[in-house]
Amino acid sequence: MAIKIYKPTTNGRRHMTSSDFAEITKTKPEKTLLESQSHTAGRNSYGRITVRHRGGGHKQKYRIIDFKRNKDNVKAVVNAIEYDPNRTANIALLHYTDGIKAYILAPKGLKVGDIVESGDSVDIKPGNALALKNIPTGTSIHNIELKPGKGGQLVRSAGASAQVLGFDGNYTLVRLQSGEVRKILSSCRATIGVVGNEQHSLIQLGKAGRKRWLGKRPQSRGSVMNPNDHPHGGGEGKAPVGRPQPMTPWGKKARGIKTRDVKKASEKLIIRHRKGSK
């Protein structure tokens, strides 16, 4: 992937960048692997806003991704690399030798015509999936399961990867992208390689309209609201917060408060917390 830079013909184009989509080999998705999805604009079943700053955006079809990778010892050929509007990573269309088609996350370096497979004794190469207990120390992995058979939940965004550090009984030590070192059951599966489209984080939207295409609405600062809308609101002119520290819209402290329950059951599986966390 390379970053496409636009000439500053307008103010909106001045700082705009995008992907050149050089890796994409097919523009129309596989119809049998599509599902329709409705947008709720951040509202729940009562019609009340539960997530702010959402709404609008382009319609999208959901691509059914195989996160489980449990089709063992059946080889598949990479038929195409496609764009997926629902995630930052690209996806690969697989054609299995038994006629089944499936989408997977496209790892870095995967090309059309490559062979991938799943199982306990498959080769250690990008796109292959196997249990953590069979992956050598130091290998980069993604799409990691937290519960055997549930499907990959960790390390799925563009350019992300984790690393196998070692083994401890029934667990495998994995260092995640955040720097957190965590124990994961060795029977859980992961896919070899780094998630592709690694330069996605360098893309600059350049204008507000592209943000709206993604279904994201404008966000107002609390200090410009009325006092009945936000703890920072009210006052004459540019008034200070007026509190010992910044607050959330719901009156809770916004900084320095732990966002994870220290009594959570999985806390004992975390060997070292992520960077910046105590």
Curated annotation (Swiss-Prot):
Belongs to the universal ribosomal protein uL2 family. GO terms for cellular component: large ribosomal subunit. Residues 210-278 are annotated as: Disordered. HAMAP family: Ribosomal_uL2_B. One of its GO terms (molecular function) is rRNA binding. GO terms for biological process: cytoplasmic translation. The gene is rplB. Part of the 50S ribosomal subunit. Forms a bridge to the 30S subunit in the 70S ribosome. Signal peptide: none annotated. The keyword RNA-binding applies. This is Large ribosomal subunit protein uL2.
